[in-house]
Each structure stands twice: as C-alpha cells, then as structure tokens.
A protein has these predicted regions:
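The beta1-alpha1 cofactor-binding region of Rossmann-like NAD(H)/NADP(H)-dependent oxidoreductases
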Residues: 43, 63-74, 106
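Residue(s) in the substrate-gating loop at a strand-loop-helix junction
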Residues: 144
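Substrate-binding pocket helix/loop in short-chain dehydrogenase/reductase
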Residues: 100-101, 108-110
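C-terminal helical subdomain
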Residues: 180, 184-185, 205-250
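Active-site helix of classical SDR
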Residues: 124, 160
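Conserved glycine-rich cofactor-binding loop
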Residues: 10, 17-18
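Conserved glycine-rich Rossmann-like NAD(P)H-binding loop of the short-chain dehydrogenase/reductase
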Residues: 33-48
Length: 250
C-alpha cells in the first residue's frame, strides 16, 4: 500500500482537466491529500472527481476560467472555505502558442501571458495570506524547459515561462522566512494536449514530428516529480526541478 505521506493535507490543482494537472491530482490523492480541482471543462473535472473519490480525496470541483484573475483568486478562497485551509497550491493551468515573431497573433500572445503568468500570480497571491499566517504551505509553479532555453518560434511562450521561473525565485525569497516553500517545475516535452493549442500549421507539424522521434515524458512522470517536492521534510525545500526526456537535447 502506498504510504499516505500527504494525509490531512489540502491541495488545489489548476488545469486539472487533463495532462499534468490530472495526473498530479491523482498522485496527490494517492498520497493521502484532499484535492480541489480547477479547470474550464466541467465534464472532465466531474470524471476526474469520480476517480478521486475512491482514493479518499473528497474532491472539490471548481469550474473556472482562469483568464479571469478574480476567478483565479476565487478558487483559492473556495478551497479554503470548503476544507478550512490550503496547504499545497499547484499552478499548472496554461497554454502554448508557438509561431514566428513576424507572424505573431498578439491577441493570442496576450491571452497566453495572462493565463501562464498573471493567473498564476493571482492564485498565488490569494493563497499566501493563509499560508503565512499558519507558517506552513507550498506553492508549486509549472514552468517548462522553455523557461531556461528560448528556441525559435517560442518567443512569447518562453517569455511566459522565464517569467514563471523568475517570479518563483523572487517569491521564494519573500516568503521563506514564513516557512512557505516554493518549487518551480520545468518539464521538457510531455505527451499532453498542450500542442493542440498551436495555431501555426508548419510549427505544429514540426513539433509533432519532433515529439514522435523521441520518448516523451508522460504526465505521470511530471506528477511524480511534483509529489517528490511536496513530500520532503519541512526543513527541505526543492526550489527548482528540471526534467527532460532522455532523448531530448534542447
């Protein structure tokens, strides 16, 4: 039987309707946590909730469009109201629009900036009050290897992920004395629906061909990395975790 290392801990996972978020919600539940799940697609959340219930997660389903900063803050308040507190916030919601700068759709890029960065900041801000007051809490921000290496056609996406990495480090230095831990996770290529967002046909075809040429990470691989971070003893903080497929160079 899996050790319940997160028994009596309360977690909120955004972008939980698929991919890394879905796998993370299940991993946290298997480790004993109570789990709130947030995303736009209610049907997917309801399906996930049915799988979480047998694990004892007592799931709270939060349908929300996190492009709205008030919704990003409200899901935190709703989690705290429902369970009494929030111990672990996993900011996973995001999109990936890849295209050359000269052909960029700035409206699409603005949406990506708002979801990948500003929404994450809004949820984090909402969670800090309770965590600092209790001197206990963990913020996990999902960035990307694109937050370390900026490649052609990924200018805006990389900018958002570099932003998440920088925000996470600055936040860590603001809250470490309150015993609030901050971890930023930087996955390489993962087999998720994220590439479906790419609107530039040639770039999308190239990325998909590249993905087929190697053994991609699975969402469960990233969820396991997140679980590792949030199950360390209180005196240990994993500030940054970079993971790539073995076959991925850049």
């Amino acid at each position: 039987m899996l050790e319940k290392r997160l028994e009596n801990r309360i977690a909120l996972v955004t972008g939980a309707s698929s991919g890394i978020g879905e796998a993370t919600a299940l991993a946290l539940a298997e480790a004993g946590a109570k789990v709130a799940i947030a995303a736009r697609r209610r049907d997917r959340l309801d399906d996930l909730a049915e799988r979480l219930k047998p694990l004892g997660a007592e799931p709270l389903v939060l349908e929300a469009d996190l492009l709205d900063e008030h919704a990003a803050q409200r899901i935190v308040a709703d989690t705290e109201t429902h369970y009494g507190r929030l111990d672990i916030l996993v900011n996973n919601a995001g999109v990936m629009y890849l295209e050359p700068v000269a052909e960029a759709d700035l409206g699409r890029w603005r949406k990506m900036l708002e979801l990948n960065v500003l929404s994450l900041i809004a949820s984090t801000q909402a969670a800090l009050g309770g965590m600092r007051a209790r001197r206990d809490g963990h913020i996990v921000n999902i960035a990307s290897v694109a937050g370390r290496v900026a490649n052609p056609n990924s200018a805006a996406y990389a900018a958002t992920k570099f932003g998440v990495v920088a925000f996470s480090e600055a936040l860590r230095r603001e809250v470490y004395q309150d015993r609030v831990r901050v971890s930023v996770i930087e996955p390489g290529l993962v087999a998720t629906e994220l590439r479906d967002h790419i609107g530039h046909a040639a770039v999308k075809d190239a990325i998909n061909a590249w993905a087929q040429s190697l053994r991609e990470l699975q969402p469960e691989d990233v969820a396991e990395a997140i679980l590792f971070c949030v199950t360390r003893p209180p005196h240990v903080a994993i500030n940054e975790l970079l993971l790539r497929p073995t076959d991925q160079e850049r």
